[in-house]
């Protein structure tokens, strides 16, 4: 389950040795170096989750316009309209939050708080948008025949990568306290 929208293969590396001149950074400090890039990683994850939500939304909206029930396209039903509206609101909010974080990073403003907020909100909302898209498709939405289902699987996985949603709450909580208690 997951990684349905990407090609993946395995690579095994055993007993590898390299010259000190080939090291990136300092030997034994890999995790500390990696931590410096977590915030950027979170933005990249957010961008991918947003893309999944947008793809699922596009497919759901097209399907709702084409699928006919009771002699009318299903988008004319209020429940479908509400779902599409809520999905679009989430997508717009995700875009705004991601663009804000990217702008802050580009302008050398700390994104420790905002990247955690973005990661938690965008990955959670993307999964919700994809879930609603699956619902609009009905039974076929649950199968991997629809892109919406594959998007849901991948978006759900983004809630773990780069730090779980629970870890994002921990990071954001500490930063919020610092922000308001200067």
Which residue ranges define each predicted feature?
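Alpha-helical interface subdomain recognition
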Residues: 12-15, 20, 28-29, 36-182
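Short, small-residue-biased leader/transition segments that mark boundaries at the very start
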Residues: 1-7
């Amino acid at each position: 389950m997951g990684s349905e929208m990407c090609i993946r293969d395995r690579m095994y590396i055993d007993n590898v040795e390299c010259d000190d001149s080939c090291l990136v950074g300092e030997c034994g400090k890999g995790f500390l170096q990696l931590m410096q890039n977590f915030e950027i990683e979170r933005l990249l994850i957010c961008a991918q989750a947003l893309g999944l939500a947008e793809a699922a939304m596009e497919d759901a909206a097209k399907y709702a316009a084409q699928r006919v029930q009771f002699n009318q396209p299903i988008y004319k039903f209020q429940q479908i309209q509400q779902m599409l509206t809520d999905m679009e609101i989430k997508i717009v909010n995700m875009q705004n939050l991601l663009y804000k974080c990217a702008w802050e990073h580009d302008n050398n403003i700390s994104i420790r708080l905002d990247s955690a907020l973005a990661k938690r909100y965008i990955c959670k909302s993307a999964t919700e948008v994809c879930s609603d898209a699956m619902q609009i498709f009905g039974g076929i939405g649950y199968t991997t025949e629809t892109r919406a289902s594959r998007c849901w699987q991948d978006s759900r996985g983004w809630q773990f990568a780069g730090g779980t949603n629970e870890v994002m709450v921990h990071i954001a909580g500490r930063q919020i306290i610092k922000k308001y208690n200067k």
